Amino acid sequence: EIGLDGFVPELNTPEAFAQQQLFYKAQLKLAKQYQLPVILHVRRSADLLLKGLRDTPVMGGIAHAFNGSLQQAHAFISLGFKLGFGGALTYDRALQLRRLAVELPLSALVLETDAPDIPPHWLYATAAQRAAGQTQGRNEPAELPRIAQVLADLRGISLDEVAAVTRANAIEALPRLK
């Protein structure tokens, strides 16, 4: 996984962010040289990542935990990327993400868990619940079928179709998964 993190404060000092950009560009060059797909860490950095991909085209990959705009989604897709959707999709309040999951072609989506991070809503414990002693549920790959069911319900299609298409998409994005 390569990319830029525009969210974590200590990674966003001018020096740290410049270093992130330096590493990102170097990693893109390696991916291009060795004809490897990349999994992109896209955290408040989609436009800068897209610029890097236009400057150094690679064979595609996955924009992990995608949470950008429709325009950014289409830009990643046009560059050969699939968009990763996971636990965040399960939250009713994730309106933009849910809208994207319905509006974008299913052929552009892959499912992921980001385990143990980004838990689906059924595992999430609020700060108040955690303060009261409730533990945060542990996200793991076993949650993927339920996340897939959420996507199927949002799109009004079968779980089997979501599973088959997103599996094929993952193999297309990361051919060595075969």
Residues of each region from the PLM?
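Catalytic pocket-lining loop regions of alpha/beta-barrel enzymes
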Residues: 13-111, 119-122
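Short acidic/histidine-rich active-site segments
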Residues: 107-129, 133-137
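Mid-to-C-terminal alpha-helical segments outside catalytic/metal-binding sites
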Residues: 30, 138-178
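Conserved, mostly hydrophobic/aromatic
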Residues: 1, 31, 76, 101, ...
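Alpha-helix N-cap and loop-to-helix initiation/capping positions
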Residues: 11-22, 128, 132-139
